[in-house]
Amino acid sequence: MTSISTTHAVAPQQGELHRTINWQGAFWVASGVPALVLFSIGGIAGTTGNIAFAIWMTSVVLGLIQSFTYAEIAGLFPSKSGGASVYGATAWLRYSKFIAPLSVWCNWLAWTPVLSLGCSIAAAYILSALAPIPAFSEISPEVVAWLADPANLGKTATDAIAALTAAGTPAIRDWTLYSGTLGPVSFSLNAIFWIGVILMLIVFSIQHRGILGTANVQKIIGLIVIIPMLIVGIVPILTGQINWDNYSPFVPLATAYSAEPGEWNIAGWTLVFGGMFIAAWSAYAFETSICFTSEFKNPQRDTVRAILYSGLLCLVLYSLVPFTFQGVLGLEGMLAGPIVDGSGVGHAMAQMVGGAGIVTSIMIMLMILALMLAIMTAMAGSSRTLYQGSVDGWLPKYLSRVNPHGAPTAAMWTDLVFNLFLLAIAAADATSYFFILAVSNCGYIIFNFLNLNAGWIHRIDNGHIRRPWKAPTIFIAAGCFLSFVNAMFMGAGAKVWNPWALWAGVIAAALIIPVFCYRHYVQDGGKFPPHMLDDLGLKEGDLAVRKAGILPYLTLVAGVAVVLIANWIFVI
């Protein structure tokens, strides 16, 4: 048995991450998570209607309950980076070599698209500022003049607005170097793509300095962004701008993206589960704060504090911002195109606090910073997941390379290249954007299922290992129950975003099998690195002892059954 002791800052060995931060540093690196609410706030309103605010509140509460399991298992591994996926993978290793790497892979699949999705939205904000689309109304002088022209006799104001908007739209907004389709999605090398590439390279250069430099930069940006988000969540309540009628009737929509109220029937519940499914991608994401355990000066103290304080921040912001958005904008406003695709969120936030002119410009700039913060959080977390997966023998060896600053640069380059491909898809249209988001979230739900159940598996197989912090057993049990609830969300709700999302997500998750086989059987000769189980005081031969018996296998079968049954029962 290996005792877990307090680890102070020491000189790192060559090729290792550096112990340079405390829980506050991880908190600020994870402070980009609240900005993820802005990725899909309109999309969830479009699928759930007047209950959208409740979807967000419920989802973040579920995430907070689940975090107790993650905090406990993270304490078992003070020398590992990469987050809950890495810690949970070790629990499943006794029962299957192939299930364990699935945890690491699916967590990476969930986190890495934040780079491309965030860059596409931020690029859209920048493009709108540099080359805005003109706005006209029925009483605009240009519209009146267009209708008065004899050549337009019999035309309507709608025709006039469409024609004038098309004529006044800058050519750069329609320009693309190349475009096409890839199965159910499109791709485009347009202006949004190229601006997004620049933003991605900026984030890469900041991350290249190592975790301490990243945490310091994100602390500054985090304060700039979090405070305005709190203002947006509080000011409309204090100034009486909330229209309480915007929360009723408390029923789902009849059909997605239609303002017609529906009923609590199968179709209605399907849309609700679709909202819960996609909200989980944002609301559970503060677990990334424990990706940095091997970079904590004192992992025994810092790990649990990092995830719980990050969770409380998300609880506040994920409750306030959707609540005030809906209360001020109403369902019609939330279903507006610029809100659904994210490009008009900054302008809406400025109006909510009574801003205009320069205030609107400042709010849009803050929105760009919020997205950059989320992108930095994603690159920091996902690259460390790849790094630790490589160190532990799950993923190819090259991913374990770090630079002199202690940054996992090989993993970061992999993130960058993969997301350039995703960015071309996300920049094409909203349908392609939400397809990436839904497929990514299938990976996240699979990761979530495996790691919530890893809590009780570790209790059975590694109960003798001292834990720096031990969660109340009721939270371990609750986490197990919620793993099946989340599986139901995926089975029932993924189809809401794209008919192929669930199956594409399963295929994406299965890609780890050839990757793992290459590393394990080709590069490592069928053996795991000796240090992989050091924290648990085990050797590879000890993995044959399976105290949980068939329970983990029954859990997997039950999880698959829940997904398939939910997919069959709940239809639109």
Language model features by range: what are they?
Residues A124, A129-A131, L223-Y257, T324-L329, ...:
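Hydrophobic alpha-helical segments and their helix-loop junctions in multi-pass secondary transporters
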Residues A191-V251, I307-G311, L437-F449, F475, ...:
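Membrane-interface loop-to-helix entry segments
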Residues L38-W146, R173-G183, F187-A191, L313, ...:
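Extracellular loop-to-transmembrane helix junctions
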Residues M1-F53, M57, G63-A71, S79, ...:
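Membrane-interface "cap" regions at the ends of multi-pass membrane proteins
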Residues C106-A124, I278-F296, G357-P396, L437-G455:
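Membrane-helix boundary/coupling elements in multi-pass transport proteins
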Residues I21-F39, S67, F193-I202, V235, ...:
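Hydrophobic, membrane-embedded alpha-helices of multi-pass small-molecule transporters
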Residues S85-R94, L127-A166, F250-E263, A306-M376, ...:
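TM-loop-TM module centered on a large, flexible mid-protein loop between adjacent transmembrane helices
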